[in-house]
UniProtKB/Swiss-Prot annotation:
Its cofactor is divinyl chlorophyll a; divinyl chlorophyll b. GO terms for molecular function: chlorophyll binding. The gene is pcbG. InterPro entries: PS_antenna-like, PS_II_antenna-like_sf. This is Divinyl chlorophyll a/b light-harvesting protein PcbG. Belongs to the PsbB/PsbC family. IsiA/Pcb subfamily. Keywords: Chlorophyll, Chromophore, Membrane, Photosynthesis, Photosystem I, Photosystem II, Thylakoid, Transmembrane, Transmembrane helix. It comes from Prochlorococcus marinus (strain NATL2A).
Length: 354
């Protein structure tokens, strides 16, 4: 984190990431703990939505975000193809049990294992130490992350191919073979909001899996070419810089997801998420429902699509502000100068020379 040259800098309790900045073991513990929280929230929220689900009202009008996502990937349907919530409780309970496993892993890494992997038990462990101004170290860790993302894409593609996912074009769950047409994949970079068939959606995921796993292997196996210069980030690459990159990525993905969710009914089927939205502008952009949802059981009476879209957009917006904040700090700007300048306005004096 940015210390402005102070080797003994301290952070408030709210700056939780600061205590794991240079300690990869603690960083892993934090990752596992966060994953456990997410898994528990997903499982518990799914059970809550299932308990309050009213089959007489469209799912998209009940703000059932977790149920809607499960229905989209073909979970919860009976043998007749009707969504009844079958097996949904089992999925939720598995997530809750998994959260306990993640919590155990977090506590183990936090309390029992080395906080700094540079002192780890073997050379393999030590490769994952955190050296923020060492591009070879960071690219090695990045490579493993990319491979995990690629494996997740493969899992989704295979799930759709073997089990099947919901296709709004026919109103039923079906098995989907991915379309690995590179021309379509390239063109969908620019019109992805208009994708209207699942084959192209799965083809994009299959292509991403290849790119991410190939890129991951490349980053693990290679080191930088030539001297590590300022042009390549020397003196700038830091924990704060990497944090800013991460915030930019997740912020951009959230905003893209908001636009996609607002209008696309192939990836976000209308029966589960509600009708497409209309974009409006006030103090900031926002999306509103285009149909009457007076029977909605959701808080404030909106569709699932409206809730999901607006929350994604505003989270994405604030993540991007966080990106700018941390990126500017990583470049060396001291925001305390702004605070001091504002605080000194009442003491400022203007001298006019003849």
């Amino acid at each position: 984190m940015q210390t402005y040259g102070n080797p003994d800098v301290t952070y408030g309790w709210w700056a939780g990431n600061s205590r794991v900045t240079n300690r990869a073991g603690k960083f892993i513990a934090a990752h596992a703990g966060h994953t456990g929280l997410i898994s528990f929230a997903a499982g518990a929220s799914t059970l809550w939505e299932l308990a309050r689900f009213d089959p007489s009202i469209a799912m998209g009008h009940q703000s059932s975000i977790f149920l809607a996502h499960l229905a989209s990937i073909g979970i919860g349907f009976d043998d007749a193809g009707v969504w009844t919530g079958a097996n949904v409780a089992s999925v939720a309970i598995v997530h809750i049990i998994a959260s306990l496993v993640y919590a155990g892993g977090a506590l183990s890494h936090s309390l029992l294992f080395d906080g700094d992997l540079a002192d780890g038990p073997g050379p393999t462990t030590q490769k994952f130490k955190l050296e923020w101004d060492n591009p070879d170290n960071l690219t090695f860790i990045l490579g493993h992350h990319l491979i995990f993302f690629g494996v997740a894409c493969i899992a989704f593609v295979e799930w759709a191919r073997i089990h099947g996912i919901y296709d709004p074009a026919i109103g039923a769950v079906r098995q989907v073979e991915y379309n690995l047409n590179l021309t379509n994949i390239w063109n969908h970079q620019f019109d992805f909001l208009a994708i209207d068939n699942l084959e192209d959606v799965l083809g994009g995921h299959a292509f991403l899996a290849f790119v991410e796993i190939t890129g991951g292997a490349f980053h693990i196996a290679t080191k930088q070419v030539g001297e590590y210069t300022e042009f390549k980030g020397a003196g700038i690459l830091s924990a704060e810089a990497v944090l800013s990159f991460s915030l930019a990525g997740i912020g951009w993905m959230a905003i893209v997801a908001a636009f996609w969710c607002a209008t696309n009914t192939t990836v976000y089927p209308e029966p589960w998420f509600g009708e497409p939205l209309a974009l409006k502008f006030g103090i900031s952009p926002y999306w509103i429902d285009t149909v009457e949802v007076s029977e909605s059981t959701a808080l404030a009476g909106h569709t699932t699509r409206a809730a999901l879209t607006n929350v994604h957009y505003y989270f994405g917006f604030f993540f991007l502000q966080g990106h700018l904040w941390h990126a500017i700090r990583a470049l060396g700007f001291d925001f305390r100068r702004v605070t001091n300048a504002v605080a000194g306005l009442d003491r400022a004096q203007i001298t006019l020379n003849d």
